Structures are given as C-alpha cells and as structure tokens.
Design a protein with these regions (language model features):
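Conserved N-terminal phosphate-binding loop of PLP-dependent enzymes in the Aspartate aminotransferase
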Residues: 2-168
C-alpha cells in the first residue's frame, strides 16, 4: 500500500504502518511493514506564485516516486491511500490536479485509490465527503468518528467487474 509522509491512518494494527509517528511507545508492540512512503506534496499557505511552483514540483516528484515504487514492486502494490485533507498536526491540503494524477496512475496500473475520510467525511467540509470537492473519485472510502461506527464504501461499478469480490 503506497502512502504519504505526514499521514495519519490510525494507531493500531496495520494502520500503524501507514501512520508517521516517532514515538516508539505507540508502535513497539505492533508489526510495522516497509510499504512505500511518498513525499507529501501538500499546498503551503499563503498560496503565492513561489509556493504554488514548489507544490507543483513536489507533486511531480511524488507521482514519479509512486511510478518508481510500482515498477520496483511489480504485482505487489494493491493501492494508494491518502486523506483528502491531512488533519493531524495541522491542515495539509492538496490540489485537484494531484488527486487526478493519482487517479490516472491507479487506472493505468490497475491499483485502487483509497481516500481515508475518517477525519474529513460526513459533512465536515461542507459536502458529505471531502473528495467531492475534487474531480478524482476514489475506489474505496474509509470513514468513522462522526458516524459512531467505522465503515468502508466501495465503488460498485468497479467491484462488480470482479466476480466474487468481498463487497458483494
């Protein structure tokens, strides 16, 4: 699972392999997997011409690193996971063009795009899901917190193409 630096996807089990934390007390009793962790090309505010140019360069570099991770791990990359807004330790926002680049990479390589909406879903951004502010659509959404339960939503059209998929 390709994921990003400065991400927060949880503090238990496999989610720790996707979360950046430097406090060993939080992960010492859990397995940690060496999955590809990619540069985080979030926007830097204020959005000046200089900051935007830096963001675009970082997006291109992140997409290149993802391509390299896919090529060096053939048939081993199942998904890319990202929070539409990284909300741990500040707000990190992404450009629509970056999410579209992720969507294209996933489509070209037959891997899933997962949006972790645990902190951003259920109307907190003004839309039901934060990804609805962008053009790229995920294959899977994870959600929780505000719903009092956690869950996973999957793209019906995509998964109906797969006989006996786990979402039937």
């Amino acid at each position: 699972c390709i994921h990003f630096k400065q991400a927060f996807h949880g503090r238990s089990g496999y989610t720790l392999s996707l979360t950046n934390t430097s406090d060993p007390r939080k992960y010492q009793y859990f397995p940690k997997f060496d999955w590809p962790r990619i540069l985080n090309p979030h926007l830097n505010f204020p959005i000046t011409e200089e900051n935007l140019e830096e963001t675009i360069k970082n997006e291109q570099l992140a997409l290149l690193h993802i391509q390299e991770a896919i090529l060096s791990n053939p048939d081993q990359v199942a998904c890319i996971i990202i929070e539409p807004i990284q909300a741990e330790g500040g707000d990190h926002h992404f450009r629509d063009e970056f999410f579209q680049g992720l969507r294209n990479l996933c489509d070209d390589n037959e891997i899933l795009l997962i949006f972790d909406e645990v902190q951003t879903g259920i109307g907190i951004t003004g839309k039901m899901w934060a990804f609805q502010h962008f053009t790229a659509k995920p294959d899977i959404i994870s959600f929780g917190k505000k719903t009092q339960v956690c869950g996973v939503l999957a793209n019906k059209e995509k998964f109906d193409e797969i006989p006996n998929n786990v979402f039937r």
